[in-house]
Each structure stands twice: as C-alpha cells, then as structure tokens.
Amino acid sequence: VENGGYELEKNYADFWMPSCTKDASSTGSYAWETTYAGKWYDGKTWKAGQGSLSKEIVLNLKLNSTHDYNGNGDGNTFSVYLGPRNRCATDICIASGWGACPVTPYFVEQFRNDPRFNACVWSCKDAGFSADESDSYEYTGYYTRKYAPMCFADGTRQEVGFQLGEQHQNITYYQDYTIMRYADVLLMHSELNGTADGLNKVRARVGLEPEDYSIENIRKERAIELAFEGVHFWDLMRYGKDGSYAAQEIAKAQNGAKVKNGGVETATKFAVDNFTSKKGLMQIPKTQITLSGNVLTQNAGW
C-alpha cells in the first residue's frame, strides 16, 4: 500500500476515456485525454498513441481495435452492450449500442449529489437527446459512462474503430478494462484494518470531508467509487456468504423500479426467494461434474 509506487489520479474522471472527454462545444474539438493507451482527435484526424499507464492501475487488461471474429487480436467486446439503442446528440461522445445495463433509479437517488456521479453515469435528458423508448427494454433514462462505447462527434455517430476500418464495430472498442486499481486497494486496506485512513484518502480525491470508520461507510464508499466496474455484485456476495445480504440489497434497487419496456411504463421485479435458494450461485454445468468423476457437487437449489 505504501511502497508499491501506486497513487490516485488527481481527477477521478480522468481515469476513464468516456468520462474525461472534453465537450466539443467548449473546446472546439475533442481532446480525448486518457490515463492509459488510447487515441485522440486533433480536430482533423484520429491519431493512435501509447499513453503512459496510470499509477492508479494495479492490474489492467490491455485491449485494442484490431479484434476480428476469428479470434485474432484482443478487442473490447463488451462496451457495445452499454451504448443506448439509438444515436445520441452530437455533443456527447458515446456511440449507439445494445442498451444493456441501464442505471437504476435507486442508484441515481442515492448518489446524484456525489461528485463522482457524472463520471459514472450520463443522463439522456441532460445530453439533450430523446431515446427511442419503443426500441428499449428496462429504459430508465440513465446509462453507464466509464466503459461506454465511443464515437465521433461529427453527427455520424459511428463507433471509432469501425470508422477507422478496424474490423466490426461490435468488437473493436479500444478502452482497456481495469481489473484492480489503487482506490480499491485503499478501501480494502481500511476494511481489513478497521481504520478510516484509506477511506478518507479516496474521499479526499473528490473533495469530500473525512468520515469515521464503519463497515457501513466502507460499503457505501465502495458502491460509488467502484460503480460499474464489475465489483459491486461480488462485494454484496461476500458481505453475506449465503446470498441473503446480496438479495436484500438487490431487491432495494430492483423491486418496483420504474422502467419502460418498449415504451410502456412498468415496474421491475426481483425474485428474492429464487436468488436466496441458490445462495446467489450459478449452476455448475453437468458436463463438468461428470468430467470430475462426480467429485464436484451441484450448487444448492439447482
């Protein structure tokens, strides 16, 4: 923690390319800054470049825009899920996608006033565009930003890798995926040692006042600091190993959440009993149980 050479980025939003992109209306052109390898637009063309790795990165999965459907290259194939179902206003750099992972109203209500919120989430209304709600499922009006697909700002809305002729747009997003960063380590250190030191270093980065140590404060801080980075679900699972704590927290966010399916307003439902009966675990494939000579036993509830 102290001698590994790691440190927090000065600005929280600068860690993710979609979060730190400058507004074209104010800069005249996009200068897409990033703390890792990326590309930027100089107002005329796209340029490839190898940025220096952020000192906040502990473990990083490097990705590029040369992936193809034959398995060549190492492209980002998940960002396409996170874009909205139709094209956005031209003053936002986020490309269209498959409309998955909409942000729940519960998250918005909890963290709207946190200084990290706009680096994590973008609002259709604030971006000045109306979604085609008839083509969306579980639409809430909010999408994740950190790993969103990126595109040109000229109104064509084409994804960058596709426009550059680098294979198919669904598999050529070049944003890296960070498996672990230093902020996560600091919060884990606080949790393990029962002190507020790491917690308050993370809070100080975004100008928040110090807090006393409590497991509740640690859990809330992790929920916003590491939002939409593939961490929160596993935090919920480890907080209660039988899946009951995770079920309780997921139900708060998903039971009765107002969404639109095909343009029709409805409310989501979360099957708590189904989740807890399986302790939140997936089914072990029967083929793997057979291959193990029945050493493996099926998870409860399946």
Describe the role of every protein-language-model region.
Residues V1-D135:
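An aromatic- and glycine-enriched ligand-binding surface/loop that stacks and positions planar moieties
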Residues V1-N3, L59, F117-W122, D176-A204, ...:
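Extended, hydrophobic/aromatic-rich amphipathic alpha-helical segments that build helical scaffolds
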Residues E7-K22, C124-G128, T144-F162, G240, ...:
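Short regulatory "switch" loops immediately downstream of catalytic or recognition motifs
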Residues C20-V80, Q169-T172, Y177, R203, ...:
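Long, intrinsically disordered, low-complexity segments
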Residues V103-R181:
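Flexible, polar/acidic helix-loop-strand segments at domain edges
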